[in-house]
Swiss-Prot record:
GO terms for biological process: ATP synthesis coupled electron transport. Its main location: mitochondrion. Keywords: Electron transport, Membrane, Mitochondrion, Mitochondrion inner membrane, NAD, Respiratory chain, Translocase, Transmembrane, Transmembrane helix, Transport, Ubiquinone. Its EC number is 7.1.1.2. The keyword NAD applies. Signal peptide: none annotated. This is NADH-ubiquinone oxidoreductase chain 4L. The gene is MT-ND4L. The keyword Transmembrane helix applies. It comes from Martes americana (American marten). The chain crosses the membrane at residues 1-21, 30-50, 61-81.
Amino acid sequence: MSMVYINIFLAFILSFMGLLIYRSHLMSSLLCLEGMMLSLFIMMTVTILTNHLTLASMTPIILLVFAACEAALGLSLLVMISNTYGTDYVQNLNLLQC
């Protein structure tokens, strides 16, 4: 396993640990999720380029599309919660249920 893979895996683990530690605020959770998506994108791209997998070359682009959709939904939820309650606590998400 090369140093590139180790560093990318370490970035993923640090983002995941940040998600577990800072889960009370929505903005921190969204930033950690974006870090996880970025490390997954880089790992998939490096793996595809080193193994010359031409059939799977579209997979990182699809991952970026899903990451952009996730970020847009998360930011819209963050704006709605912060306008309604004035904070970005995740515990306010339970109040949005019908």
